[in-house]
A protein has these predicted regions:
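Cytosolic juxtamembrane N-terminal segment immediately preceding the first transmembrane helix
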Residues: 1-55, 65
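Helix-breaking motifs and short loop linkers at transmembrane-helix boundaries and internal kinks
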Residues: 51, 67-68, 91, 99-100, ...
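Residue-level signature of mid-helix packing/kink "hotspots" within the transmembrane helices
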Residues: 53, 81-90, 140, 175, ...
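Extracellular/periplasmic helix-loop-helix junction of adjacent transmembrane segments
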Residues: 56-88
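Hydrophobic core of transmembrane alpha-helices in multi-pass small-molecule transporters
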Residues: 115, 127-141, 149
């Protein structure tokens, strides 16, 4: 009887020991994912907002006068940026299914950094609109692409805090850009014949480039596309095959009927709900016509706030 009791106790101790080791391995894996996956996407989103808010800071720090921007030029340039951002979101997400995220996200970061550098040489409003549009095409990979990446590494109960940290990094970028512009304008305005707002874009690029390099070397991408023997990557020194196998196995298997690729388009159109929603969006002409009028004719200015009620009436929300 005593032997059986000792045997049961020994089994319980061994079971607890195994469970404890698994918990330690899980925490270590999560720490590595946070350190190399979450850190890169947060840095990417942070510099995304530094670049984005930096444009507005440059506008009020001399760019408006130097380039003779008038009227709604700032609004138009921001609208061009948003058009590029919207246009680029879906293609960027589809590219993540064809090209490893380590390569694509790093490339996009480098590309918009290079375009940011080009902003310091602009001499006209047309140059600004062209660069801002292509900047937005590459920057649009960040938000939706990041949530796709995070959803591939983290379980459902692990995502909220990571998503909050990721979103917060963008807000920090907005604040940092303002402080940086103040310092640049104070110390570099006129240095080497360049206005302070031009130095802002140069320094933005100098910050963006190391982040792109960091992503290419240390960011592991997706668990399914990551190997412990990856070339040109530090993944083989960060994760071992056992950890990568566990990272893939601990998440629920993907339902192939919800797979996002080029076959998604005909699936949506064939489905009655998706097709009807698309047609309804085009049919509700009042929605986009009212915005078109507001953008092209009146513009978003304080003196035009009086038109807001008329726009709301046009859209049918008030009698």
């Amino acid at each position: 009887m005593m032997k059986e009791s000792k045997s049961i106790t020994q089994h319980e101790v061994e079971r607890e020991s195994v469970s404890s080791k698994r918990a330690i391995k899980k925490r270590l894996l999560l720490f590595k994912i946070d350190l190399f996956v979450l850190s890169f996407v947060c840095l990417q989103y942070w510099i995304n907002y530094v670049d984005r808010v930096g444009f507005t800071n440059a506008y009020i720090s001399g760019m408006k006068e130097d380039l003779k921007m008038v009227g709604n030029d700032l609004t138009v340039s921001n609208t061009v940026f948003m058009i590029g951002y919207i246009v680029g979101m879906v293609p960027n997400n589809l590219m993540l299914l064809c090209v490893p995220p380590r390569i694509w996200l790093s490339f996009c970061t480098f590309a918009w950094g290079l375009l940011t550098l080009g902003m310091y040489k602009v001499t006209s409003f047309k140059h600004i609109c062209a660069i801002r549009f292509f900047q937005a095409l590459f920057e649009s990979c960040t938000f939706s692409g990041t949530h796709f990446v995070l959803g591939s590494w983290y379980k459902e109960d692990e995502l909220p805090i990571r998503s909050a940290i990721f979103t917060g990094s963008g807000l920090v970028g907005s604040m940092f850009s303002g402080f940086m512009q103040t310092s640049i304008f104070t110390h570099l305005n006129g240095r080497n014949g360049l206005a302070g707002w031009r130095w802002l874009f140069i320094i933005d690029f100098c910050i963006t480039l190391p982040i792109a390099i960091y992503g290419f070397i240390f960011f592991p991408g997706l668990p399914d596309q990551t190997s412990a023997v990856s070339k040109f990557s530090m993944t083989r020194y960060i994760f071992n095959e056992q950890e990568l196998h566990y990272a893939r196995r601990r998440l629920p298997a993907r339902d192939e009927s919800t797979r996002l690729d080029w076959s998604t388009i005909p699936r949506v159109l064939k489905g009655g709900t998706g097709g009807c929603s698309l047609l309804f969006g085009f049919w509700e002409v009042r929605t986009w016509v009212s915005h078109l009028i507001l953008h092209l004719h009146y513009g978003y200015k304080t003196k035009n706030i009086r038109w807001r009620k008329e726009i709301i009436i046009l859209r049918g929300y008030l009698p």
